[in-house]
From Swiss-Prot:
CC terms in the record's Gene Ontology section: nucleus
Function: Involved in the base excision repair (BER) pathway, by catalyzing the poly(ADP-ribosyl)ation of a limited number of acceptor proteins involved in chromatin architecture and in DNA metabolism. This modification follows DNA damages and appears as an obligatory step in a detection/signaling pathway leading to the reparation of DNA strand breaks.
EC number(s) reported in the record: 2.4.2.-
The UniProt record lists the keyword Transmembrane helix: no
Gene3D superfamilies tied to this protein: 1.10.20.130, 2.20.25.630, 3.90.228.10, BRCT domain, Poly(ADP-ribose) polymerase, regulatory domain
InterPro entries: ARTD/PARP, BRCT_dom, BRCT_dom_sf, PADR1_C_dom_sf, PARP1-like_PADR1_N, PARP1-like_PADR1_Zn_ribbon, Poly(ADP-ribose)pol_cat_dom, Poly(ADP-ribose)pol_reg_dom
Lineage of the species this protein comes from: Eukaryota, Viridiplantae, Streptophyta, Embryophyta, Tracheophyta
Biased amino acid composition, Basic and acidic residues: 1-49, 145-154
Segments forming domain SAP: 71-105
Gene expressing this chain: PARP3
Record protein name field: Protein ADP-ribosyltransferase PARP3
CDD domains: parp_like, WGR_PARP1_like
Positions that bind Zn(2+): 113, 116, 129, 139
Species: Medicago truncatula (Barrel medic)
Segments for region (Disordered): 1-55, 140-161
Amino acid sequence: MKVESRSHNVHHAHGEEEKVMTRKQKAESKAHEVEHSPKKAKVEDEKNGHTNGKSASDVVQEYDEFCKATNEQLSLEQMKEILEANDLDSSGSDLEITRRCQDLLFFGALEKCMVCNGNMEFDGRRYGCRGFYSEWSSCTFSTREPPRKDEPIKLPDSVQNSPVSDLLKKYQDPSKRPQRDLGLAIKPFTGMMISLMGRLNRTHLNFSGASCLVASPAERDRGGTSKLADAMERGIPVVREAWLTDSIEKQEPQPLESYDLVSDLSVDGKGIPWDKQDPGEEAIESLSAELKLYGKRGVYKDTKLHEQDGKIFEKDGILYNCAFSLCDQGRKLNDYCVMQLIVVPENSLHLYFKKGRVGDDPSAEERLEECENVDNAIKEFVRLFEEITGNEFESWEREKKFQKKPLKFYPIDMDDGVEVRHGALGLRQLGIAATHCKLEPMVANFMKVLCSQEIYKYALMEMGYDSPDLPIGMVTNLHLKRCEEILLEFIEKVKTLKETGPKADAIWSDFSQKWFTLMHSTRPFIFRDYQEIADHAAAALEGVRDITLASHLIGDMSGSTIDDPLSDTYKKLGCSITPLEKNSNDYEMIVKYLEKTYEPVKVGDIEYGVSVENIFTVESSACPSYADIVKMPNKVLLWCGSRSSNLLRHLHKGFLPAICSLPVPGYMFGKAIVCSDAAAEAARYGFTAVDRPEGFLVLAIASLGNEITELKSPPEDTTSLEEKKVGVKGLGKKKTDESEHFVWKDDIKVPCGSIIASEHEDSPLEYNEYAVYDPKQVRISYLVGVKYEEKDAVIDTAE
């Protein structure tokens, strides 16, 4: 067996990775880590801040001396014996064992975690639980003031007779033990040695035992000095000075990777996990990254075997290609894994295995082996599957039976197809494809947009589901259904939640870890409220579902575009799209409706207006015909917001009801199709970024039925509305002026009017929303291509 080795140190130090901020947390400045403090188990003189007659500084000094003495007098083996004698975990690094043992001997044994009954442990900043809440998640409970057992520490014989025994016995009496006070201001760099270089306030170049090197930008610009190279060779992180100032400001060491200064100078490349990069830098990497695995038959690009016409090995109906995900917030894990058997011409068979973190290839565990025979290759593949998942391979592949195990990977069930980030048109292909397209030019340009990689890359990047190592836009319906079931189950649990405090937080944490294992994200976080569930779970799942369907419709356009792939995809839509004449009455009516009901989208202090680029009429076989819809009662022409990445699915399958019911806009009416009489509301969905000003708004004819229910607040239960399929109108803070409304052709109402304040100023809705529960009562009629433009912008034409 020939082995090609590549990189690679396994990158996980058990529970030692730095905490990072998610995109959501950075964007909204939600620094809301919740720390819960059980009833204090210490005696404190509140007047002078002393515990048991000793000041906090005295306790710190005494503990430092105690640690120095035990380090000198106790061996690591003796410390393990002490931990085992007190029924505590004796595994881990030397530092973890020592810190765990010294905390036990000096301050006393900790009580079990109040959430999961696991063991609590000091991590240098706070006490965190090391137990598991479920097979999907570690317990994430932490506190600065944990309760301790009111009992003496058990000392093994080897320690009883040691020179340090008298010192240890001094702290045996629980009533006389010092109390650790972590509520006071903590020095952010406790336990770290920091070296400085360059034009900083201080210079210190002794690297012995250094945790990191803080260097000036000038050192980076010079391409790396010998001193800087020395630090890199020793594996010492080199960071910008901002790391120091930010850590001091936030009173906690910030993740070193986010302040990296020079790792891109190393031979292996930058190697910073995406979830530890600044969101702006991560976005740039994401958009320029090449998808490495496009689906169940895709050969992982890092193998280079696709260049030799390599194919995924198939036997007895099984494709030997698996992808996995694991997100564990308690252990700071967010990993993917890929394993494949690849056949190249002349029957050469290779086993490929890779496990790591997105963006950190230099630290990934990776192997590519040429196999001597098929049977041995299959045995090794099956062994690896069972090792990383704890499940049998064939039970998964043939029956999709799988039981998640703690800290084990879960399969991402890839579908047999080509994900759009690979199969759709790249930037260089777009012009050629449109030139060769036989469709009407405006329609060809429209299809060019919907068949481009760009809109799908942006959508996945903005949702945080943009891993280049996993084809999240080419998963099976079964996988999507599992995600939906877990989401609905969690929402039901939260709505009837009786637990409070840490136990309620644990339920949210468990769901978050489960969710981001099933839906691998480059920026996982712990959900805290319904709005985050709506934005980052429900809407994201709907988006991934729509992108998956787009992947199947588009197929693989990565080859020649001479065969007119745009026309081929257009035919698959089962939909007729025709440009609307700009001098027609319908065109003028739609422009008027847009201008009357639009309010500028605000981004920071800048407002964006909108202009109409073109309008298309739509005849979709997935929607009721015009002849059928006009026979229905209470017909209204309404605006629907949609991302460009969702449009292929809408045109091919029609609108689908929302995936769940949540007490937030867009989901508060349950599993309904939601529209608005305000173009402003639809525009908020269609507008994604200032550097991508083009978008589409949908105009649909909706029949609200004979009975319309008006609601001023979210209904407690949407089940009856969903069952009766009645039309619902949610009353917003703003409405369109009813005196300006008019009736269009065939008794279709157009609520076109200036936006004015309503009498419902306490409504959770900004504008009126209309909910329809039966897709057969909604007909997509027009697509309005718009361009968002900065208001009052002055273009400088001076040279």
